[in-house]
Amino acid sequence: MTIHNLYIFERGGRCLFYSEWHRRRGPGIPQEEEFKLMFGMLFSLRSFVAKMSPTDMRDGFVAFHTSKYRLHYLETPSGLRLVLNTDLGVPSAREALQHIYGNLFVELVVKNPLCPPRAPVQSLLFRQRLDAFVRSLPYFGPRNPQN
Amino acid sequence: MSRQGGRGTESKKMYWYLPFISPSASLQLMNSELFTLTYGALVTQLCKDYENDDDVNKQLDKMGYNIGVRLIEDFLARSNVGRCHDFRETADVIAKIAFKMYLGITPSITNWSPGGDEFSLILENNPLVDFVELPDNHSTLIYSNLLCGVLRGALEMVQMAVDVKFVQDTLKGDSVTEIRMKFIRRIEDNLPAGEE
Amino acid sequence: MAVCIAVIAKENYPLYIRSVPTENELKFHYTVHTSLDVVDEKISAMGKALVDQRELYLGLLYPTEDYKVYGYVTNSKVKFVMVVDSSNTALRDNEIRSMFRKLHNSYTDIMCNPFYNPGDRIHSRAFDTMVNSMMMQVC
């Protein structure tokens, strides 16, 4: 059980933050491209999920999984999107994402008057605290060799 | 005979909760009088710096806007409110949750326009203006204009362009403070070029 | 009911004087001014004893043939002086104390007004209303 990486996007598509822990192979394209690809996919998935939903939807797109990993997604009404990739052993990372948003991002980045809103996160404190939090999660373990 | 500061019974405590960053995070209380005095000092310093009531009003609005774009994230994180479906729901959330959370008051919502795109918030008491009396040379000053900026900035971050202004103010002799909010349009997502 | 109420700053200049209008105002101003000496005397007498419970109310400063003058000093050395008609014997000490307490509360409210600079003359409508309620109703 492990956590691969985390992305934070804002509404216009820019990636504000990226951090990885156990990523075995990269995508083979430059990081800018990777962010654009990720955002584009999320956007399409979101609108697809909304259109195809058989009943009224509250949260919309929450997660998807493949045979190798699971992607968890949290979107705030203010347009902030948090994406966490974990391995298949993690059923839901919603609380973790909410904690990262409410207690780390809002407290350390949003409330910092020196961080302009919607700009890439430079805050070292945020990175450290996030790292400490992610490592403290019960499903963060050493990378399973099979994955 | 010892003398009590007789205003102790009236001072309202505002509760600001620290989230659980660490297990020893505690409840922090702040006296609302300190907040009122801080805001008053801010406004009077702006008056001294700008000397012109209109400029002060504009600055307060700008400052409020900067606060609003950040405050909305804190509000969403703490209150867990999802997207509002229409303007009426937005009005309810603003009056019953947001004002209560940040200022400790619950304004009432009245005067809906027939099209449902304008309404008024009536504040019986405004904690920003406790003890304040506007002198005669600042009759056009909108003392609590910061609130207008905050509301405008916060709603802009959730894709609503609104116009917010004071129509009645207890400092100017009216019986209540009334804020009029008008929905202008929805701000659409604009995608970066090359997407879809 | 008071005949004249004055608020004097720490440096002994008046921040606010209001008296019943039909009387000779100058006489009241003079009375208040001379009473300041008595106030200073009382303050210095108290200061030496260093009591742990500083009494803010000074009591009767001195009686003249028509009037009685009462004093009150705050911890920041702002003094309130009240001139009361001698013929009004119904006024007891407790009432005078409560009137001073109201004055003190209104004064602190003025200090909290961000537009008021300490040391300025007092121009507050709320303070005026409160003082008017304490002055004698002269028709």
UniProtKB/Swiss-Prot annotation, chain C:
Any Pfam family from its record, for instance, is Sedlin_N
**What protein family does this chain belong to?**
Belongs to the TRAPP small subunits family. Sedlin subfamily.
Per UniProt, the keywords (alphabetical) are: Cytoplasm, Endoplasmic reticulum, ER-Golgi transport, Golgi apparatus, Transport
What is the predominant subcellular site recorded for this chain? Answer: cytoplasm
Encoded by which gene? Answer: TRAPPC2L
Q: Which residues form the signal peptide?
A: none
Q: By what name is this protein known?
A: Trafficking protein particle complex subunit 2-like protein
Q: Which domain of life is it from?
A: Eukaryota
Functional description taken from the UniProt entry: May play a role in vesicular transport from endoplasmic reticulum to Golgi.
GO CC, alphabetical: endoplasmic reticulum; Golgi apparatus; perinuclear region of cytoplasm
One BP term from GO: endoplasmic reticulum to Golgi vesicle-mediated transport
Write out the annotated subcellular location: Cytoplasm, Perinuclear region; Endoplasmic reticulum; Golgi apparatus
